[in-house]
């Protein structure tokens, strides 16, 4: 299945929010230790809850929040798994739906270039984790992830929310 770290963006109010996985441009990421992933949630007229699906690990529903970054602690990734993030919308709201953000999570990277890209992302996520509960300027963060094209779609400051997945609305896929 192809990956695309950017999802959402349809005209429907629920699906209009842009969702972006903060991963290398290859859409493949080995989280390493500590195991963290991050989703950038764009502006939305009516924010919806966020559904996070990670392969066979499970599906979690996180509460609706305004634009910002969700830094998420995850269970161990023992094999390559598809990670999908999408808003929770009823079919009546949008029968077609916008594509979810999709990325591959890996237990480790095999190629040196991928290892270096993963390390840069881990350093960015580590810096974000130090600022949980505060905010970060959007423009430098977007540059760090080669996402400058989103600058006009986001507020100048993005709140950082840090949350574990394990205790939140776990559902077996």
List the predicted regions and their residue ranges.
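Short, compositionally biased P/S/T/A/G/V-rich stretches that sit at domain boundaries
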Residues: 1-32, 114
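Extended, polar beta-sheet/loop recognition surfaces of beta-rich domains
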Residues: 13, 24, 28, 88-133
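Contiguous beta-strand segments within globular domains
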Residues: 28-42
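Exposed aromatic-hydrophobic patches
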Residues: 39, 67-76
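Short proline/glycine-enriched turn/loop motifs at strand-loop junctions of beta-rich domains
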Residues: 42-48
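Short, aromatic- and glycine-rich surface loops/edge beta-strands on solvent-exposed regions
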Residues: 50-52, 79-93
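Solvent-exposed serine/threonine-rich low-complexity stretches and specific carbohydrate-binding patches
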Residues: 55-68
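Preference for solvent-exposed, low-hydrophobicity sequence contexts
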Residues: 132-173
